[in-house]
């Protein structure tokens, strides 16, 4: 255990929610490299994958405004030190003025915001004056400012607790469908607020990310299967791939031929293969795109109809409305995401259990 500090074990536990001794062993195994220890735990199926954002202490609000014509929208994350201050009327006024300034000066970054004028002085001066009045450090941490070109609609959703906000842009072709597209965008934004997709589409993933996530996923399924086997329950299929970006034309053609060879070996007449193979291919794709189903907006199953993915919902609306709909932008803010939880007096407890 030489060189592995109690603080490092605590940090790994906060990041993964794995057991303390598992964290200790992982750090020893990888010579104290935190990122490698996280990967080690995930590949062993020991990480409970607790998101850092679920464990942070940052307070404040996520606020957004969608203009009445649904052609632009602003969203901002403003952090305070305590929840009490976030509910303060002075803080609420600061949030309102922040959105107004973003809108008035076409701002897209926090740097632009701080330099922008408000009441004949830089916004940064106004912010400092409010920090002095309110008595806590306040940070404008993130800004999203979306603009919609012709035949695009922007809508969004902010959770009532002001801790999550989502903006969605949808492209459409038929102007008469605009009101329905507005409603669809809001419903999908509500879905994303609840289900936390990381990206819009699997194309937004890197191959390295997918391979790493797939290893962790396989370890998780194998661990679940051990318990299922013990209880006499059906086992889950172990995937070869994790995302649609791995399923090249060559991979799909190879799998189709494998299914056809299997049917041939079973003595099934070739004339019925076309009725069997598509269903097998559909199941193969579903089993081998689990990362997409978990982490992409288009790949997730819709909370209002869990038999359809978001992509299928959009396709069905396109067909029903005689239109061609495409989600072109997706932005999700969650309060404090990526900020580490304030250190607690926990290192001593870890140290005692490591002796």
UniProtKB/Swiss-Prot annotation:
GO CC term (a single one): cytoplasm
UniProt cross-references to CDD domains, sorted A to Z: UBA_EF-Ts (cd14275)
Primary subcellular site in the record, as a coarse category: cytoplasm
Entry-linked InterPro entries: EF-Ts_dimer_sf, Transl_elong_EFTs/EF1B, Transl_elong_EFTs/EF1B_dimer, Transl_elong_Ts_CS, UBA-like_sf
A UniProt-annotated Pfam family: EF_TS
Listed GO MF terms: translation elongation factor activity
Subcellular location: Cytoplasm
SUPFAM superfamilies: Elongation factor Ts (EF-Ts), dimerisation domain, UBA-like
NCBIfam families for the chain: tsf (TIGR00116)
Biological role stated in the UniProt entry: Associates with the EF-Tu.GDP complex and induces the exchange of GDP to GTP. It remains bound to the aminoacyl-tRNA.EF-Tu.GTP complex up to the GTP hydrolysis stage on the ribosome.
Name of the protein in its database record: Elongation factor Ts
Organism: Helicobacter pylori (strain Shi470)
């Amino acid at each position: 255990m030489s060189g592995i500090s109690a603080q490092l074990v605590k940090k790994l536990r906060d990041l993964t929610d794995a057991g303390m001794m598992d964290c200790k062993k992982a750090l020893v195994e990888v010579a104290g490299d935190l990122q490698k220890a996280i990967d080690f735990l995930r590949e062993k199926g020991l990480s409970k994958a607790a998101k850092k954002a679920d464990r942070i202490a940052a307070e404040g609000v996520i606020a957004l405004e969608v203009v009445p014509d649904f052609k632009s929208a602003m969203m901002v994350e403003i952090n305070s030190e305590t929840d009490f201050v976030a509910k303060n009327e002075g803080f609420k006024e600061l949030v309102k003025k922040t959105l107004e300034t973003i809108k008035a000066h076409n701002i897209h970054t926090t740097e632009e915001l701080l330099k922008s004028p408000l009441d004949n002085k830089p916004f940064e001066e106004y912010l400092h004056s409010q920090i002095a009045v309110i008595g806590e450090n306040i940070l404008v941490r993130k800004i999203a400012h979306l603009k919609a070109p012709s035949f695009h609609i922007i809508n969004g959703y902010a959770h009532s607790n002001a801790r999550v906000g989502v903006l969605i842009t949808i492209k459409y072709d038929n102007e008469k469908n605009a009101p329905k597209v507005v409603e669809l965008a809001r419903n999908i934004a509500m879905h994303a607020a609840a289900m936390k997709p990381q990206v819009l589409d699997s194309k937004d993933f890197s191959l390295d990310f997918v391979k790493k996530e797939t290893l962790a996923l396989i370890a998780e399924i194998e661990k679940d299967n051990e318990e299922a086997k013990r209880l006499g329950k059906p086992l889950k299929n172990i995937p070869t791939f994790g995302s649609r970006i791995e399923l090249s034309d060559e991979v799909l053609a190879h799998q189709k031929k494998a299914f056809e060879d299997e049917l041939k070996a079973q003595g099934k007449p070739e004339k019925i293969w076309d009725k069997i193979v598509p269903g097998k291919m559909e199941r193969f794709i579903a089993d081998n795109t689990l990362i997409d189903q978990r982490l992409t907006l288009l790949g997730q199953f819709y909370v209002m109809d869990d038999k359809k993915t978001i992509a299928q919902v959009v396709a069905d609306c396109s067909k029903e409305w005689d239109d061609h709909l495409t989600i072109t932008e997706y932005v999700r803010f969650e309060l404090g995401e990526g900020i580490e939880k304030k250190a607690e007096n926990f290192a001593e407890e870890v140290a005692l259990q490591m002796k």
